[in-house]
Amino acid sequence: MQIAPRLPCKSGAVSITTPRVFDFNLLLTNIFGRNSKSVPRRSAKPVDRHTITVCRPAGGTVDRRLLMNATLPAHLLAMERRAVPAEMIAALKIRFAERCSTAQAVREQHGRDESPFEVAPPDAVVFAESTEEVAEVLVLADRYAVPVIAFGVGSSLEGHLLAVQGGISIDVSRMNRVLRINDEDLTVTVQPGVTRNQLNNEIRHTGLFFPIDPGADASLGGMAATRASGTNAVRYGTMRENVLALQVVTATGEVIRTGTRAKKSSAGYDLTRLMVGSEGTLGIITEVTVKLYPQPESVSAAICHFPSIDAAVKTTIQIIQLGVPIARCELLDANAVRAVNLHDKLSLREAPMLLMEFHGSAASVAEQAQVVQDVAREHGGENFEWATTPEERTRLWTARHRAYFAGMSSHPGCRTVTTDTCVPISRLAECIDLAVREADEAGLPYYIVGHVGDGNFHIAYLIDPAKPEQRETAERLNEQLVHHALKLEGTCTGEHGIGLHKQGFLIDETGLATVQMMRVLKRALDPKNILNPGKIFAL
C-alpha cells in the first residue's frame, strides 16, 4: 500500500493505493470512524486495485507511522490515538509507584513485537503482580475509556502488542507462578507470565510435561490468547484442545472464571473457547489451567533428506494417512537448513529435510520409525540419521525453534513477512508447490519451515526495510498464498492469530456476516472498545 499526503483538503488528506480487493465503505469507516457524517458513501461492491484520496475530518490525529507501515487496507483501522488523561497516569503512579513507568525506553520495549509494524508506543506501562492489580488498572481504564494491552514476552508475529490507539500496557511477566499441580488429574494451573520452558522445568519431577511448544519461549497467557500451537500439535493438539479453564478480567474490571478441571462439561456457553484465541480483545487472562501428559517411556528423533520439497511433503501426507501416531513432523527447506547450519554451527545436508520425533513404548517407537523409513524411501528419502540421546534431540529441536532468527541472521538488517497458512493434509503438497513457484518467480530471498504433520507451514520472506518495493512484493506473495489456501479449504492463520496483519483475510475466510457477529460479541463484552482495540477487526 502506498500512502502520501495531498494538499486540497484543509483537514489533511491521505492517498491510498490498495493492493487487493476490499470493501470501500469498510475502509472509509476504519479511517473516519463509524459516526462521521463527512464520510463519502458508495455501494458496498468490492473495488479492485486503485488509488483514492480521502480527507481526515478535523479533530482527529493520524499516526503516520502506522500509515506508512500499513500493507493492507484493514491496517488503516484505529489510527486515532486516544488521549490518556494526566489524572489517570497520576493515579497509576500513586498506586503502583515504580511499577508504573512512563520512561521512553520502557514504553518502546512494550511497543514492539516480532511483527514488521512500527507504531508509537503505549503511554505508560504497568507491571502487574496479581489478578487484583490487573482488575484495578481495568477499572481505571473503563472510567477514562483508555485502551489496555496485555504484554507477556513480546513474541507476537502479527502486531498483537502494538498500541495502535495508545493507552496502557499491562506487563504480566511478573505473574509467573505455577499455582497448582494436580498430577493425579494431569492438570496444572498457572499465572499468565509462566513460560512453556519454565512450566516444564517446574513439573519435571512429576513425570508429566506440557507439550505445546511454539518456536518462541512464549508465555502461557499469550499462547492461550492467540490459540497457539507448535511442533507437537500433530499428536497433542493446540491450545484450543489443551486449555481447560481460565480466570479472566473483563473490560470493567470484573474477575470471572470459565471452565473447570473436569474433562468435559455441558454447562452453558463455552466461554473458555471464546476467550482462547481472542487476542486480548475480550478480556485479560490471569490464570490458565491446561492439560498435562505423561512423559513417554521412549523418545527417538530422526532427520531425513529428500530430493525435493514435494517428496518430503508427500511423505508426510502418507505418514498421517497411515495413522502413524508421530509426535512431531517438521519440514525445513534447503534455505532454512543452510541458515540453521550457520546459526547453530551444525553440518546438516543442505536439502529439504523432515525432522521427526516418535513417542511411546520402546516397541511402539521402533515400529513407528520403521514404517516412516519405508514410506520415506518410497519418495526418495535418504540419509536417515537418528538422535537417540536427550542431548542430541535437544540440539536438533533447539536449532528448529531458532530457525526464524537463523533465517533473519542470514541476511543482516532484514525484516520478515511471515505466512501462516494451514490446509487439509491432502491439499498440502499442492499449496506448498504453488507457494514455492511464486516465491521463486518473485526473486525475494525466503525460507520455509512448517508443522507439516498438521498441514501448517510458514514461508518467511526476507526484506530490506529500506526498500518498500520488497515489502510490497512480500505482501503480494502472502496474499496470493492465503487465497490459494482458502480455495483449498484452509485458513489464513494456523497459529499466529489475526492481529493487525491478517484482518482483510479474516473477512475473505469467514465472510462479512461472521465478522459482524464477532463485532457484536466484542461490543457486548467491551462497549468502550478498550481491550486491545484495533486487533482482529475494526469497530
Language model features: what each stretch is:
Residues 1, 14-16, 27, 50-51:
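Intrinsic low-complexity, disordered N-terminal segments enriched in polar/charged/small residues
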Residues 11-15, 33:
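Intrinsically disordered, low-complexity segments enriched in small polar residues
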Residues 23-25, 30, 35, 48-50, ...:
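Intrinsic-disorder-associated, low-complexity terminal segments enriched in Asp/Asn/His/Tyr and depleted
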Residues 63, 67-139, 155-186, 336-344, ...:
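N-terminal flexible segment immediately upstream of the FAD-binding catalytic core
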Residues 101-112, 293-294, 300, 305-480, ...:
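C-terminal substrate-recognition/cap domain of FAD-linked oxidoreductases
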Residues 177-330, 531:
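FAD-binding subdomain of flavoenzyme oxidoreductases
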Residues 254, 503-539:
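Activity-critical C-terminal alpha-helical subdomain
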